[in-house]
Amino acid sequence: QFKPDPPFISGLELAGVVLEADPESGFVPGDTVIGGNKTGAFAEIASIPAGGLSRLPSGLSYAQGAAMGAAYSTAYTGLVELCGLTPDQWVLVHGASGGVGLAAVDSAKAMGAKVIAATGINEKRDRISKLYDPDAVILAEGRFREQVAEITDGHLCDIVFDPVGGDVFDES
């Protein structure tokens, strides 16, 4: 864990407008960006290396863009860097109605995986289906292993992504 020496300004993820940029950075003043650094994101003006920035996707507010970093980088790290996700693998995502879970469903689908989204909140099943188009949405309660086996024709899952933990993970 990174522990900066005081005094320092907190904050990891940010979104904003480029005020100044090195000509070789690929950014120009006025560009809207998202990014982060180990500290300083809560400052009114932050100095961030160009490698820590990306363009703010169109249609997103600054708040949405800044929030993407934690959820999507966590999902990417788990799915790709730790589990080696490849297209056509079956991925079971627990906590699919939360921020990191939704990012994992979205990312895995974008990378060509077959995704089963599991949520403990029945009221959120339709929203997950409409917004993120997983291959299936199940309730993560009781013994859901049989549901997964039925959906995957007995294959079960190549990757279980679980930002929740506890009994649900043990069942997986």
State each model region's role.
Residues 1-40:
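Glycine-rich beta-strand-centered segment in the early N-terminal region that forms part
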Residues 66, 72-142:
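Mid-domain Rossmann-like dinucleotide-binding core that forms the NAD(H)/NADP(H) cofactor-binding site
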Residues 21, 95-96, 164:
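NAD(P)H cofactor-binding loop motif with strongest signal on the N-terminal glycine-rich segment
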Residues 46, 75, 108, 128, ...:
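Terminal peptide-recognition signature
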Residues 116, 136-172:
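Glycine-rich cofactor phosphate-binding loops and adjacent beta1-alpha1 units
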Residues 3, 32-95, 131:
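NAD(P)H dinucleotide-binding glycine-rich loop of Rossmann-like/cofactor-binding domains
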Residues 28-29, 86, 155:
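Residue-level recognition of short, solvent-exposed, well-ordered loop/turn junctions
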